[in-house]
Amino acid sequence: MASSGGELGSLFDHHVQRAVCDTRAKYREGRRPRAVKVYTINLESQYLLIQGVPAVGVMKELVERFALYGAIEQYNALDEYPAEDFTEVYLIKFMNLQSARTAKRKMDEQSFFGGLLHVCYAPEFETVEETRKKLQMRKAYVVKTTENKDHYVTKKKLVTEHKDTEDFRQDFHSEMSGFCKAALNTSAGNSNPYLPYSCELPLCYFSSKCMCSSGGPVDRAPDSSKDGRNHHKTMGHYNHNDSLRKTQINSLKNSVACPGAQKAITSSEAVDRFMPRTTQLQERKRRREDDRKLGTFLQTNPTGNEIMIGPLLPDISKVDMHDDSLNTTANLIRHKLKEVISSVPKPPEDKPEDVHTSHPLKQRRRI
């Protein structure tokens, strides 16, 4: 692994900066050319090795610059590490691994006091306990991520199944209502009130019909061939069957109407509970418009069946002349005045726009 003896503080292969990758796809190229290298958890470390630092006593500034990306636990200069002339090498240990990742990504190949820094991981400085802790943290992170992903996938499947079930129920209810309506229309138009099996009526309907009719369609043929001995009994069966059919049709209509009412109630409750703000505003606006239209209709309604709201205004008092002839003359004068007032045309109201058009303004001179 090591190129110079493999001792601690010497130059390792993973410390050497790699060349720029020229075979990288165009859509994967960044703002500046980079080398391509994959880091696993055993190659990453809290220890960072900084090479290319100018030897002008800038250790304090270097530590302050790296402290921007996380808490630093310790730092020191590596005097025995092979370096270029007039440069120094420093070792910095961060408190957590994520801070070290960020600092390496941000500070690698950055200009610092005239020099170009090269930052790399130094896992060879880790102790056995630090390595064990690093691997355990990585394992816990992987377990947590996979659990969240599995939970999300399971939740998504449950939501999809619930949605499919609701769609199936809605389709089923719509088909049932359509079938039952068609059956009711057919039975109302025909003389025979028997309903088709496509209405999906409960089995008790047909069983009760067969039991109560006492074998009507099948047993009536031999009875009718017995020279009219059971004529009164057969007529009684017919009347009983007719009344039974009417009762069944009424009960079916009620049963068909009930699901629709329940569904309407459920939908109204859902709307009241989950109505958005925009929908509420639109509903209020619609109600105001309906009230305004109703008020306009009541005002312009020519019929006498007007809805009066509030107390009636007092009528105009009529002057009594204490003489029939004088009262007749006064009524004639009042009617004549009303006719004259109604026949006089109203003068047209001159709008300010008409005034402006009749008297055009003088055009301003352009200077």
Curated annotation (Swiss-Prot):
CDD domains xrefs: RRM_RBM48 (cd12442)
Describe, as the record does, how this protein assembles with itself and its partners. Component of the minor spliceosome. Within this complex, interacts with ARMC7 and PRPF8/PRP8.
Q: Name its species.
A: Homo sapiens
| Gene Ontology cellular-component annotations | nucleoplasm; spliceosomal complex
- Keyword Hydrolase assigned to the entry: answer is no
Biased composition annotated in UniProt, kind: Basic and acidic residues: 347-357
Write out the entry's keywords from A to Z.
Answer: mRNA processing, mRNA splicing, RNA-binding, Spliceosome
Give positions of region: Disordered: 217-243, 280-302, 343-367
Q: Which GO terms describe its biological process?
A: mRNA processing; RNA splicing
Name listed for the protein in its UniProt record: RNA-binding protein 48
**Entry's family note:** Belongs to the RBM48 family.
Coiled-coil blocks = none
InterPro entries noted in UniProt: RBD_domain_sf, RBM48, RBM48_RRM
Q: Name one GO molecular function term.
A: RNA binding
